[in-house]
Amino acid sequence: MDVKIFKLSDKYIRFEIDGITPSQANALRRTLINDIPKLAIENVTFHHGEIRDSEGNVYDSSLPLFDEMVAHRLGLIPLKTDLTMNFRDQCSCGGKGCSLCTVTYSINKLGPSTVFSSDLQAVSHPDLIPVDGEIPIVKLGPKQAILITAEAILGTAKEHAKWQVTSGVSYKYHREFHVSKKDFEDWQKLKGACPKSVMSETDTEIVFTDDFGCNDLNVLFESDGVNMIEDDSRFIFQFETDGSLTAKETLLYALNRLKDRWDILVESLSE
């Protein structure tokens, strides 16, 4: 099995895997969607009552939104994730919550103001902050305040969408478009628009591949003078993450997760 990276950034990856079957490709896709651990807020405690600032001014910590709505918004905020942490139900603390499986956050802010995700302060793990600090949570009016504590734990998208790391996970066969220069007049225009996609060229034919994602090649699907060949052992994958994990971390975890599952199956069959 060979892997070739076409494009890689912190949140996006496009790559080719050669030497696998369609069922293996689909297993990788499902793992990328459902089985990647992610940190997300699970429990939120609202502290209601009067709050005084340093000058003695009194604020009311009741919010203009229902507590459940604010808690739901907090749960959907992407958080930086440490894959060395434990799932709470598998932790040595017995599910009580400790520094190995739980991250504690707090928000303490006075109105009038808008509470953003950047106001979510990590108490126990300072590095595990929100991915984006500009996500609005709730707007506070004069004399209003918010004082909460929250617990974040690891989970997967099998349990809830807030634990889904990836989006747009897709794959397709490696495709080659054998274009007749005689029958397809715009081949030179495509060559100029998609230079990386040119695989080979002769006096009568030019061969393109859409592995690099050049959208100009879409015209070839319905054009005369084009012979498309698909290889069902080579797959082009792409996906992006919400920033809780990098695209590279996500892919490596998914591949190792699949390997572990196959190893367990082989062991069980050999017993």
Curated annotation (Swiss-Prot):
<dbReference type="GO" id="GO:0003899">
    <property type="term" value="F:DNA-directed RNA polymerase activity"/>
</dbReference>
<dbReference type="Pfam" id="PF01193">
    <property type="entry name" value="RNA_pol_L"/>
</dbReference>
<dbReference type="GO" id="GO:0046983">
    <property type="term" value="F:protein dimerization activity"/>
</dbReference>
<dbReference type="InterPro" id="IPR022842">
    <property type="entry name" value="RNAP_Rpo3/Rpb3/RPAC1"/>
</dbReference>
<dbReference type="InterPro" id="IPR011263">
    <property type="entry name" value="DNA-dir_RNA_pol_RpoA/D/Rpb3"/>
</dbReference>
<dbReference type="Pfam" id="PF01000">
    <property type="entry name" value="RNA_pol_A_bac"/>
</dbReference>
<dbReference type="InterPro" id="IPR011262">
    <property type="entry name" value="DNA-dir_RNA_pol_insert"/>
</dbReference>
<protein>
    <recommendedName>
        <fullName>DNA-directed RNA polymerase subunit Rpo3</fullName>
        <ecNumber>2.7.7.6</ecNumber>
    </recommendedName>
</protein>
<keyword id="KW-0240">DNA-directed RNA polymerase</keyword>
<dbReference type="InterPro" id="IPR036603">
    <property type="entry name" value="RBP11-like"/>
</dbReference>
<keyword id="KW-0808">Transferase</keyword>
<dbReference type="GO" id="GO:0005737">
    <property type="term" value="C:cytoplasm"/>
</dbReference>
<comment type="function">
    <text>DNA-dependent RNA polymerase (RNAP) catalyzes the transcription of DNA into RNA using the four ribonucleoside triphosphates as substrates.</text>
</comment>
<dbReference type="InterPro" id="IPR050518">
    <property type="entry name" value="Rpo3/RPB3_RNA_Pol_subunit"/>
</dbReference>
<comment type="similarity">
    <text>Belongs to the archaeal Rpo3/eukaryotic RPB3 RNA polymerase subunit family.</text>
</comment>
<comment type="subunit">
    <text>Part of the RNA polymerase complex.</text>
</comment>
<keyword id="KW-0548">Nucleotidyltransferase</keyword>
<keyword id="KW-0963">Cytoplasm</keyword>
<dbReference type="GO" id="GO:0000428">
    <property type="term" value="C:DNA-directed RNA polymerase complex"/>
</dbReference>
<dbReference type="GO" id="GO:0003677">
    <property type="term" value="F:DNA binding"/>
</dbReference>
<dbReference type="InterPro" id="IPR036643">
    <property type="entry name" value="RNApol_insert_sf"/>
</dbReference>
<keyword id="KW-0804">Transcription</keyword>
<dbReference type="GO" id="GO:0006351">
    <property type="term" value="P:DNA-templated transcription"/>
</dbReference>
